[in-house]
């Protein structure tokens, strides 16, 4: 079973973009993400990533 949450590195790999580009999408509110832990590691829920991809196809 696939993990529910993805790191920004994993999202970047899925989208074939850089981690910096993914961080910019998160920072700008384009891609929903949550911060985990004291250090604030970003995580993207797999379902939200799938919704993001589907929305991009619909544009």
Give a label for each model feature.
Residues 1-21:
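Polyanion-binding surface elements
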Residues 9, 29, 46-47:
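Structural detector for helix-capping/boundary residues
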Residues 16-43:
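Major-groove DNA-recognition helix of helix-turn-helix-type DNA-binding domains
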Residues 47-59:
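A short, Lys/Arg-enriched interface patch at domain edges and termini
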């Amino acid at each position: 079973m696939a993990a529910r949450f993805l790191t920004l590195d994993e999202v970047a790999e899925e989208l074939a973009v850089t981690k910096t580009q993914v961080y910019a999408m998160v920072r700008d509110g384009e891609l929903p993400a949550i911060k985990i832990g004291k250090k604030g590691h970003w995580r993207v829920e797999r379902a939200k990533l799938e919704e993001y991809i589907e929305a991009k196809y619909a544009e």
